[in-house]
Structures are given as C-alpha cells and as structure tokens.
Amino acid sequence: MLAKRIIPCLDVKAGRVVKGVNFIGLQDIGDPVEIAALYNQAGADEIVFLDITATYEERKTIVDVVEKTASKVFIPLTVGGGISTVKDIYTLLRAGADKVSLNSAAVKNPLFIQEGAEHFGSQCIVVAIDARKVEEDKWHVYVNGGRTDTGIDAVHWAKQVAELGAGEILLTSMDADGTKDGYNLRLTDIISANVSIPVIASGGCGSANHIVEVFAHTSVNAALAASIFHYGECTVQEVKQKLQYAGIEVRI
C-alpha cells in the first residue's frame, strides 16, 4: 500500500500567503518562500502553491515567487493559478515546479489536459476540482477562484479528467473550505471511488483527527490542509503520528 501524503497548501495573493473562509475574507499569513521552507523541514510530503487570484485577474502565476520557493523546497511542489497554455506549464516546470494544477482553463478546454499530459507526462498534470453541493449527492464544478458555477457535474468531470490523462485530482469541497469542520467525506468518497488516479482531499480540515477520518473513510491518497499548519494548531509530524496510531501508512 502506498503511504498517504500530507500536503500543506499555500494560497498566495499578491505574493503573500493568505487564508480565508469559503474562498473570501482573506487574512495575511506570511511570506511563501519562508513558509514553504518551514514545511519542507517539518516533514511535509509535498507542497501545493496556489496563486488564488491569477485566473480571475487574468494574469500569470508569479514565476519569480515560484522560483524562490522551489529553491528552498526539496519535496514535490505543485503550482496552480492562471495556467492556460502549454507554454505556461513549461515556464512553471522550468521555474522549479514538479507538477502544475489546472482548473478554469481545463474546464474551458478539456483537451488542454491531454495536451499537457502528452507534452510533459501525466505525472506533471494535476486537475483541481472546486465542487459545491447543489442537491443531495450532486455537486457542480466551480471555476474562476470559486466564483462561477459551470453547471458541470463534479463526478462526471472527475471521470473525464482521468480519461484525458490527468495524473491526479485536487478535490476541494467549497462548502467545507475554511470552516474547519472536517473534509466533505461524502463528496470525497464518491469522487475517489469513481476514478483510478490519486485524489487529494481538500477543504475543511480543522484538526489532525479530520485527516485520520478522511483516510479511514475514503480511498483518497493525500490530504491537503492550510490553517491547522499555518496557525501552529498542529504539526505535520503530529498528524503523521496520529495516522500511524490509527494504522494508516505514512512516511515519517
């Protein structure tokens, strides 16, 4: 069995790490380069760096911040935000990203996923799915930083991105995001059961127990969290120890 991964997330706006509730109400947390370096030392398995307003403001991800972050981080770094062309992917991989996260551009042009996978390999292509509940056991895909309802069924889209060559799905429950009430287990379970590629659970983590819970009750491969780590509520190692006690395999 593959070890489960713990992934701190750096949501970056104007070159600073921020954290908000339900995608709004953003608070400044600090410098992305310093924070990424701390998580690298703390035993994180990977880091996700999301330039959260890049797509909405129609500007490119801050490549220099990516370069500086990548120079301090020796674990896989996934970068997302404003990526809409193969050239964008190339630029970020060259800047030091190991993977790129596609969202709005992939929904607009699903063949972009295939194009990215063919050029750089599926292992480089993560598709981020921001999903919001519309009725019982039904979720829609949202784009543009969670501002626009596409009307696309999230389960159907997850299957499609896997078929198009994505190597991984970063699944965020917009209903849970920032609430610290725990991951959306129902959404996460349904999506991870419907695809054969790895799924990263995101949105709602408020404690180490929530991470234990998402691995115990769904087949996700990784858990992403921000505020519990940013605010020092628990460390990556504390989470991993809890997972070990629960019989869940992690890299210590």
Swiss-Prot record:
Gene3D superfamilies in UniProt: Aldolase class I (3.20.20.70)
First-tier enzyme category under EC: lyase
Name of the protein in its database record: Imidazole glycerol phosphate synthase subunit HisF
Gene Ontology biological process terms from the UniProt entry: L-histidine biosynthetic process
Keyword line: Amino-acid biosynthesis, Cytoplasm, Histidine biosynthesis, Lyase
Record organism: Bacillus cytotoxicus (strain DSM 22905 / CIP 110041 / 391-98 / NVH 391-98)
Catalyzed reaction equations: 5-[(5-phospho-1-deoxy-D-ribulos-1-ylimino)methylamino]-1-(5-phospho-beta-D-ribosyl)imidazole-4-carboxamide + L-glutamine = D-erythro-1-(imidazol-4-yl)glycerol 3-phosphate + 5-amino-1-(5-phospho-beta-D-ribosyl)imidazole-4-carboxamide + L-glutamate + H(+)
Pathway: Amino-acid biosynthesis; L-histidine biosynthesis; L-histidine from 5-phospho-alpha-D-ribose 1-diphosphate: step 5/9
PANTHER family: IMIDAZOLE GLYCEROL PHOSPHATE SYNTHASE HISHF, IMIDAZOLE GLYCEROL PHOSPHATE SYNTHASE SUBUNIT HISF/H IGP SYNTHASE SUBUNIT HISF/H
Gene that this polypeptide is encoded by: hisF
Record note on quaternary structure: Heterodimer of HisH and HisF.
EC number: 4.3.2.10
Cellular localisation: Cytoplasm
GO cellular component: cytoplasm
Amino-acid biosynthesis keyword on record: yes
Cited function: IGPS catalyzes the conversion of PRFAR and glutamine to IGP, AICAR and glutamate. The HisF subunit catalyzes the cyclization activity that produces IGP and AICAR from PRFAR using the ammonia provided by the HisH subunit.
Active site: D11, D130
Pfam family for this entry, one: His_biosynth
Database matches in SUPFAM superfamilies: Ribulose-phoshate binding barrel
